[in-house]
Amino acid sequence: MNKDVSLGQPIVRYEDGKLFNTTDQYVTEFPLTIMVNGEEFATVICSPTNLEELVIGFLASEGAILKRDELKSVLIDDSKGFAHVELNKDLGDRFQYSTKRMIASCCGKSREFYFQNDAAIAKTSMSKITLTPIQIINMMTRLQSASHIYQETGGLHNAAISDGLTFFVHRQDIGRHNALDKLYGFCIQRHITVRDKVLIFSGRISSEILIKAAKIGVGVILSKSAPTTLAVTLANDLNITAVGFIRNGGFNIYSHPERIIDSEQ
């Protein structure tokens, strides 16, 4: 299986009243089956990059691990599309439902008892970070220009973690949840504290994305799109500042505006 994030493929295009042969970039979908302690845990449809980060972040998001020390080993066999994970503990009965799930690239899991299962992992933010409007606009501009593949295909989600000035990590994936899990895995691997960091995201802030941000532990999430009503409710409850519709030099603050300060003051 080809491991490129995107591939040039021949197509027929219609333009200016004519049909002609050309090439176009397609994003790659890669099925990765995650085995935990020898048992099939889930299959994730993803972009074939930063797979170890993805696996670690996904397991942390699911509550299977809470810290790096719980991982004994992670072996990625990308030639066969498997990730073999050994933990220093048993998963326990509550993860029996998780076996043999297929997590599509286009959407969340839409699983039963979603909020009950995630409530124990999502964190109420204690972040003290503050941002100026210029910082917010600059971070979104940088995110949008960071990926040439997104500019070529329009088919990848981009996400980054920043302190307001510097991007600590930038990741991309065909799945919006995967992009965030890669960030999460990166931070867990390196023991990076994200409480006073910002999550910058190219997609819409849905309730699932907001909960994912809470699991990662950030206090601010920025998006070029608007959030959903449930996402705003959760952001208020979890003390997360949600900023959306960042474009053309403006933006909307949907929750906890106290973290955004006027640069003129």
From Swiss-Prot:
The UniProt record lists the keyword Cytoplasm: yes
GO terms, molecular function: sulfur carrier activity; sulfurtransferase activity
InterPro entries hit by this protein: Cytidine_deaminase-like (IPR016193), FdhD (IPR003786)
GO BP field: Mo-molybdopterin cofactor biosynthetic process
Keyword tags: Cytoplasm, Molybdenum cofactor biosynthesis
Primary site of residence: cytoplasm
This protein's GO CC annotations: cytoplasm
Subcellular location: Cytoplasm
Residue positions of the active site: C107
Record function comment: Required for formate dehydrogenase (FDH) activity. Acts as a sulfur carrier protein that transfers sulfur from IscS to the molybdenum cofactor prior to its insertion into FDH.
Family: Belongs to the FdhD family.
Protein name listed in UniProt: Sulfur carrier protein FdhD
Lineage of source species: Bacteria, Bacillati, Bacillota, Bacilli, Bacillales
